[in-house]
């Protein structure tokens, strides 16, 4: 997630702050575990942040 945030910084700063604020709500351990689980899928994707493309409900929208 940290890597994701770094890419989005150049696009829009206000949105980046919003994401940072939202991150505090989650447990750090929980986000770490989740990112480890999905790391294999993310490695193949080169363009920016996967969170921006896919919403939580619809993964195959794009």
Swiss-Prot record:
Any one cellular-component term (Gene Ontology): nucleus
Organism whose genome encodes this protein: Planigale maculata sinualis (Common planigale)
Top-level taxon of origin: Eukaryota
Function summary: Protamines substitute for histones in the chromatin of sperm during the haploid phase of spermatogenesis. They compact sperm DNA into a highly condensed, stable and inactive complex.
One MF term in the entry's GO annotations: DNA binding
Gene label: PRM1
Protein name: Sperm protamine P1
Main localization (coarse): nucleus
UniProt KW keywords: Chromosome, Developmental protein, Differentiation, DNA condensation, DNA-binding, Nucleosome core, Nucleus, Spermatogenesis
Family of this protein: Belongs to the protamine P1 family.
UniProt record, GO biological process: cell differentiation; chromosome condensation; spermatogenesis
Residue segments, region Disordered: 1-62
Tissue and organ distribution: Testis.
Cell compartment(s), UniProt: Nucleus; Chromosome
């Amino acid at each position: 997630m940290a890597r994701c945030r770094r890419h989005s910084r150049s696009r829009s700063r206000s949105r980046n702050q919003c994401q940072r604020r939202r991150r505090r709500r989650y447990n750090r351990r929980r986000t770490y575990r989740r990112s480890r689980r999905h790391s294999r899928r993310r490695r193949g994707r080169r363009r920016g942040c996967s969170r921006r493309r896919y919403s939580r409900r619809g993964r195959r929208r794009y």
